[in-house]
């Protein structure tokens, strides 16, 4: 088993444990949605998740996807990302990280920059706020769109 598959399975097991601890029933559809989110690096919309899973789950609906995403978000295992357009995207990675977004195709890529965490501490120190989190987005044009 590859390291990536082992990592996905580990994340899935931890997420299922969190759901069970919250009293949430584990269904095959719920597992499939979680597995898709964990293995996806594209920050999918609910519609994209539906398109990917509907061949294997013909009875699944977009409403089922949204309902499960809401449950995952409420428990804290998924983040909902809202941007200028009307569609929400979902990110399994709930740790502090940042996004760079293509202005042409909407592609979202994660990146890490540990020094930005210092900004949170500095803001808290300078304002006496109890800082709970922060969000940073950088916009540009991805390599694929540049090459078109």
Swiss-Prot record:
Region (DNA-binding): 1-84
Gene Ontology molecular-function annotations: DNA-binding transcription factor activity; transcription cis-regulatory region binding; zinc ion binding
Entries under Pfam families matching the protein: FUR
Biological process annotations from GO: negative regulation of DNA-templated transcription; regulation of secondary metabolite biosynthetic process
InterPro entries reported for this sequence: FUR, Fur_C, WH-like_DNA-bd_sf, WH_DNA-bd_sf
Sorted UniProt keywords: Cytoplasm, DNA-binding, Manganese, Metal-binding, Repressor, Transcription, Transcription regulation, Zinc
Annotated localization: Cytoplasm
Residues at which Zn(2+) binds: 102, 105, 142, 145
Chief place of localization: cytoplasm
UniProt GO cellular component terms: cytoplasm
Function: Manganese-dependent repressor that controls a regulon of oxidative stress resistance and iron-storage proteins. May act as a hydrogen peroxide and organic hydroperoxide sensor.
Stated family: Belongs to the Fur family.
PANTHER family, per the entry: PEROXIDE-RESPONSIVE REPRESSOR PERR, ZINC UPTAKE REGULATION PROTEIN
Protein name from the UniProt record: Peroxide-responsive repressor PerR
Organism: Staphylococcus aureus (strain N315)
